[in-house]
Amino acid sequence: MKFVSVFLVLFIFFLVVLEAPEKIEAKDDKFICVVEYGGDVGPTFCNPKFFPTLCRQNCRSFKGAKGGKCVKQPKHKHIKCFCDYCKDD
C-alpha cells in the first residue's frame, strides 16, 4: 500500500510539472511597442512649434497608439514618425 501511495504521489507530481506553462517572454512578436507610422513624413509632420505634433496626434487618432515620436536620421536627413503603443511620452 505504501509503494502505491508513493507511486501515485510521484505520478501526480510529474503530471503537474509537465502541464506547467512555459516562461512568458517579455518581447513577444505579436505585440511591439514602437511601430513606424509610414515612410518619410517630412518636416511639417514633426514641427516642434506645434504641440502636440501631427505625428503624435495622428498616431493617437488614426493608429490607436498612446503617443508618437519623431526621429531624425542625420545621414539621410529623413524624418520618421514612430507610434508608441506602450507609453505616452
From Swiss-Prot:
GO terms for molecular function: sodium channel inhibitor activity. Its main location: secreted. The record marks K49, F50 as: Reactive bond. Residues 1-26 form the signal peptide. Keywords: Antimicrobial, Disulfide bond, Fungicide, Plant defense, Secreted, Signal. Disulfide bonds join C33-C86, C46-C70, C55-C81, C59-C83. The keyword Secreted applies. InterPro entries: Scorpion_toxin-like, Scorpion_toxin-like_sf, Scorpion_toxinL/defensin. GO terms for cellular component: extracellular region. One of its GO terms (biological process) is killing of cells of another organism. It holds the Pfam family Toxin_3. It is found in: Secreted. Belongs to the DEFL family. Protease inhibitor I18 (RTI/MTI-2) subfamily. This is Defensin-like protein 197. The gene is ATTI6.
